[in-house]
Design a protein with these regions (language model features):
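Short, contiguous alpha-helical
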Residues: 15-55, 98-155, 211
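C-terminal interaction segments
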Residues: 197-244
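Hydrophobic alpha-helical segments and helix pairs
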Residues: 71-119
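A glycine-rich beta-turn/hairpin centered on an aromatic-Pro dipeptide
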Residues: 142-184
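Acidic/His-leaning functional-site neighborhoods
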Residues: 172-208
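Alpha-helical packing segments of well-folded alpha/beta enzyme cores
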Residues: 3, 7, 38, 67, ...
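Short, Lys/Arg-rich amphipathic segments at extreme N-termini
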Residues: 1-21
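Soluble acyl-CoA-dependent acyltransferase catalytic core bearing the H(X)4D motif
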Residues: 38, 48-50, 56-66, 72-73
Length: 244
């Protein structure tokens, strides 16, 4: 809910037709609707204990009202719906997700990181500062890698790493411990990763929030304080082969 409120604050008294450069073709209006409807989509999946895909266009109350105050209330309401649905249904209740059946509370974590990254999109579009607690940013990297490990190479697409190459990420924020390190490689034809320390063919070192924005292509490395060591081509291949 805190992330939802922080996202909403960026949309008070803004020009909703402002383009969002990190989401090509989108405006702030579309980004706002996407986030609000996404929370309601997840809430409906959980509340109805769905075991198959739900078309987001059919979500109940999927469009915000036209007045700004009503739209903000609609946004907050979507996040609350998800929390309520998980509590009512049970955190371990199996439901549909785009990665297969997962416990209902999987959606809370997914939506937290979805909204955080889209808050970064809005902040970049508006030229505003973006901050995120390092532990949240680090978990965002972990959650994203969990998805990449499942989805990369699907439908015959090339893997974002070549056999024998490794990528190491190191978040320098105090207190993260092993949760702030990720070593990514190819094992048995699939992307695999762990929190163990290692030396990669390419390595990135910097704050967790800047690392998150870099791997999700929200900020080019040149606009961050993240340091890149090793083979630039490994990093570029990784960027080109992974989703936004």
């Amino acid at each position: 809910l805190d992330e939802n409120r922080a996202f909403a604050e960026l949309f008070r008294d803004v020009d909703e037709s402002t383009p969002v450069p990190t989401c090509p073709g989108w405006t702030l209006r579309q980004l706002f609707r996407h986030v609000g409807r996404g929370d309601r989509w997840a809430a409906q999946i959980v509340r109805e204990r769905l075991d198959s895909y739900l078309d987001p266009r059919s979500v109940e109350g999927g469009k915000p009202p036209p007045d700004p105050a009503g739209a903000i209330a609609w946004l907050h309401g979507g996040a609350q719906r998800l929390i309520d649905a998980v509590e009512l249904t049970g955190v371990q209740t199996p439901v549909w997700t785009f990665l297969g059946t997962r416990a209902a509370n999987w959606w809370v974590r997914r939506r937290l990181h979805e909204v955080a990254v889209h808050r970064a999109d809005a902040a970049i579009a508006l030229g505003s500062d973006f901050t995120l607690e390092p532990d949240v940013a680090a978990d965002g990297i972990t959650e994203w890698l969990e998805r990449v490990a499942i989805q990369a190479g699907g439908e015959g697409t090339p893997l974002p790493l070549e056999e024998g190459d490794t990528l190491h990420l190191h978040a320098t924020d105090p207190g993260l411990g092993e949760d702030g390190e990720w070593t990514i490689a190819v094992e048995q034809g699939r992307i695999a990763w762990s929190h163990r320390h290692g030396k990669g063919s390419a390595a990135l070192r910097g704050g967790a929030t800047e690392l998150l924005l870099a791997i999700l292509r929200r900020r080019p490395l040149a606009e961050t304080s993240v340091e890149l060591f090793g083979d630039d081509a490994v990093w570029e291949r990784w960027l080109a082969g992974t989703p936004l």
